[in-house]
Amino acid sequence: MKLSKIDRHLVLLTLLENGVPQGLIDANDILETLAPFVNDALGFRMETEQVLYYSENAFGTADAISFKNNFLRIHDYKSGITPVHMDQLYIYAALFCLEYVVKPENIKIELRIYKQGEVLCEEPDPEVIRAIMNKIVDSDKFLRKLKEEER
């Protein structure tokens, strides 16, 4: 299955069924970004809405993710008008490595954000992911200690 401009009416119907007022959205604008996101996720056989969990203090949900042949892909779909940053996806990559005990130095990572008809793509430096992992671990230890002291 592939999402195309022909599916515009399905996108519009789904939005209307979910309470989005008709005049508020432009299905063509949404489809311009949504189609590549969906088609890439299908093409790369990615899992969607995947929870990445390190602890009760450090977790998130990736829109689309796959890990095959030591290649981690994380894709995010953005529909708003606020500026986007890759920081969230860097954190997701770090959470993935922590949860599945994967060394970022031993894998290739590709992060993509789909927004307003554009695809932003980065291949983060493993050292940056490692630094984020360390920060997550340290922050989690600190928060656990605080919670213990509150008891």
Residue ranges of model-derived segments:
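Alpha-helix boundary/capping residues
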Residues: 15-18, 96, 136
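Nucleic-acid nuclease catalytic cores
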Residues: 52-134
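Accessory terminal regions of nucleic-acid processing enzymes
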Residues: 141-151
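Metal-dependent nuclease catalytic cores that hydrolyze phosphodiester bonds in DNA/RNA
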Residues: 1-61
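Intrinsic-disorder-associated interaction segments
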Residues: 4-5, 20-23, 27, 122-125, ...
